[in-house]
A protein has these predicted regions:
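Hydrophilic extracytoplasmic domains
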Residues: 235-236, 244-256, 262-264, 271, ...
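Bacterial Sec-dependent N-terminal signal peptides
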Residues: 1-26, 107-128, 132, 403-420
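N-terminal glycine/threonine-rich, aromatic-flanked beta-hairpin/loop signature
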Residues: 37-72, 142-293
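Short, solvent-exposed coil/turn segments at beta-strand boundaries
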Residues: 50-55, 79-82, 101-110, 201-210, ...
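Short beta-strand edge/turn micro-motifs at domain boundaries
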Residues: 127-131, 146, 269-270, 357-359
Length: 420
């Protein structure tokens, strides 16, 4: 990069060398940061210059998957008020490329990150829709009348394609048949409900994850339907009436991001933004100090401190999701927290025009172990006439947990259709 101005005069370097932050915990935010034109808060940037001719900038947790990116030897163009600069950069861990443009004056840094292209964006960045259910002949385990012997048989009417993807390598045994039954049942149930909640998912080239979703009440969900899916395969005709009149709205940016690492797609939730959104959307007065402390604890990866503060916060909010989180045991909370804050590692494969984004056995095992603890959250999401089914739901989740932990190979996630 070459500076467009060879005159290097400007403020004294010591006056602009500082850490600039717009974190909520900073009482005097001095960083104006935009990410592809959208304001980005809760971040910090180091800026330093010794001579006023070149600078070093360190970006902290701004690019998805990059804890810190240090850019050196940045040419500065100075004037009486400050220094301007621009250039191109690349992530150390994710191979993300980007452009940066900024200006620093005494007490203020303005920085725009643009032209962001995540590593593997050419392969994965796209808008994905849910597929229609396709039924046909599939080889499945079938038991004899007494359940003493199981054989592989080709059976018509089975689910070949659906929005929930499930595959497990099982043996022709009672255990294998149990895993198959639970797996097919969950695939049916999730694929039945998911189209009512989700229309499409977008993995942006800039790392943002957004979706078109519906918050209308669920239709056609009752106990007979749910348990019927353990025996009866799902069909598209069961789904279509429930989604015909649903309205879908776009989700905001900033709640989830993606990046690639070691060939896997890592999905990461922005807990700080999510917690701030829950608090700001509540009509109840929130102590800003608690919100700030939670966000700081999240950034410091202090799971138990986060749980303690969320417990205090939810005494005012009475939010069902937060209530579930703070009531799980410490071991489960630690697992959930670490999983969400470090990112969810997912495999991506493509076949016959469909894209499969899923967890393998290693990625899914922590979730399978947590399933029994999810019962209160699942029950809270069910229609009012199903709220008394806590015991049955608990039994259901325990069965799934045991069945999904037994196979050597298991794949569980989404089957999607890319727009292009």
């Amino acid at each position: 990069l070459i500076s467009c101005d060879e005159d290097h005069y400007g403020p004294a370097p010591v006056d602009v060398t500082a850490n600039y932050s717009n974190k909520i915990s900073n009482p005097n935010p001095n960083l104006v940061l935009t990410y592809n034109g959208d304001a980005m808060n809760g971040k910090s940037v180091d800026f330093s210059t010794v001579t006023g001719e070149t600078a070093i900038i360190t970006l902290y947790d701004i690019l998805p998957g990059e804890k810190a990116i240090k850019i050196t030897s940045i040419p500065l163009s100075g004037d009486t008020e400050g220094y301007s600069f621009s250039g191109n950069g690349m992530g150390n861990e994710t191979l993300t490329t980007f452009r940066y443009e900024g200006r620093v004056t005494k007490g203020k840094l303005t920085l725009n990150i643009s032209n962001i292209q995540m590593g593997n964006a050419d392969l994965w960045a796209n808008t994905y829709k849910l597929p229609e259910v396709v039924n046909g002949v599939k080889k499945i385990l079938v038991g004899d009348t007494w359940g003493n012997e199981y054989t592989w048989q080709e059976v018509d009417g089975q689910v070949l394609n659906a929005s929930c993807y499930f595959h497990a390598d099982v043996e022709a045994t009672e255990s294998g048949a149990t895993t198959q039954t639970w797996g097919n049942g969950i695939q049916n149930i999730v694929s039945y409900i998911l189209p009512q909640v989700l229309q499409d998912i977008t993995l942006g080239a800039d790392g943002n994850v957004t979706a078109s979703y519906s918050n209308d009440p669920l239709s056609g969900v009752d106990i007979d339907v749910i348990f019927g899916f353990l025996e009866t395969p799902l069909t598209q005709e069961m789904i279509t009436p429930n989604i015909a009149d649903r309205k879908y709205i776009p989700s905001p940016k900033g709640f989830a991001t993606w990046f690639q690492k070691d060939g896997k797609l890592i999905l990461k939730l922005n807990l700080a933004n999510i917690i701030s959104s829950i608090a700001s959307s509540s009509d109840t007065y929130m102590d800003v100090n608690i919100i700030n402390a939670i966000i700081d604890a999240v950034s410091q990866m202090d799971a138990m401190k986060v749980k303690e503060l969320l417990t205090t916060l939810n005494q005012s909010l009475n939010n069902e999701t937060l209530g579930f989180l703070v009531n799980v045991n410490d071991t489960s909370f630690n697992a959930i927290f670490n999983w969400l804050t470090t990112g969810i590692p997912m495999q991506v494969t493509s076949k016959e025009g469909h894209t499969y984004i899923y967890l393998d056995k290693e990625g899914f095992t922590p979730i399978a172990k947590l399933l029994p603890d999810l019962s209160p959250l699942i029950v809270s999401m069910l229609p009012e006439d199903m709220q008394g089914l806590g015991f049955i739901i608990s039994t259901f989740l325990n069965g799934i947990s045991e069945a999904f932990l037994s196979p050597e190979k298991i794949e569980f996630g989404l089957e999607l259709v890319p727009n292009k």
